[in-house]
Amino acid sequence: TTAVQQELSTGLMPVTEETDEAVDGDEEYSVYDFTQDDTETDNLLRSAGTDDSDWSKYGSRDFYNQMTEDEKSYWDAMDTICMEYLTTEGNAVNTSNGGYRMQAVWGSKLDADTMSNVAKIFRYSNPQYYFLGTALYTVYRGSEISKVWGIYPAFGVGAERAEATDAVKTQADTWQQQIDSCSTGEKKAEKIHDLICDKVYYNQALVDNNFSTENTEYSQSVYSVLCTDKTVCAGYAQAFEMMCNGSGIDAVAVTSYNHEWNKVRLYDSWYNVDCTWDDQSGGFYYNYFLRNDEYYDTCSQYSKNCHKEESYWEDYLPVCSLDSGSSWNTPGTLPEITGKADNP
């Protein structure tokens, strides 16, 4: 990184609430269509022209595994629809305000607030769905509602999205070759941290203009990291999550009111990672790499505020109790493991 970055930057865009009416483009998808065993689900995907074997590895199932069956059903429906967008040239749904969104999902037993929370956790757990924006649509069909994500304008049309998908996969595969050469999970996580920080710089101009050009900058998506050279915290965190999971390392992205960072599991213990705060104007560092919760909460009041997770993460998050002792110039050393990690 060579561009000037404001120290300790954030840049998470808040989720915006939009409304829309069901249209012909909303297929009769029900949550019950996707509560099937793995074989039936695979057959459904194949019948839609989908091959998800190279993509599903990038997402995290840690929070999904803690959900109720009704919550999982809603997640499964969104997952199948997004996988179709990722692996086919199907067009997204045109919205009444001139944008694009996912197809709606009907038949859920979830209340509106729970549906929103599941949708948010789904989005932050699946960085491979780079086309998802930050608008959460409530789609109405009579008295029934569905909560689904808006889609970046450039990715609404299937043929154009297919080109973007190829670009995302090409960069991920290029990085994967370097990551696979590392001998341990710890070294792989360090390599992922370094690759991201070395490739991109913090998009301060976008933050300064209040994200007015977000529709063409993609800062809230992994696309900004893999296919451009600038991003904000959301891009850093989702890229780290994607490449860790793709390398067989459990990682999740979590959010506060203004920031996004990661928690990663190594040797059965969880650690915090903040690539954004490690990427500084003079280069990249390791002060926020593989740290425990106590460090993030005590190194400064600003850090504590920025790393206070939003309320919908409550009861899902693992405790990060061990610390690498990293510093600005060294990535630290993981301590001897004495017990099992807290779930997820």
Where are these regions (language model features)?
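Intrinsically disordered, low-complexity N-terminal segments that are enriched in acidic
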Residues: 4-149, 337, 343-344
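Secondary-structure boundary elements
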Residues: 159-225
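Hydrophobic/aromatic-rich core segments of domains that either
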Residues: 234-298
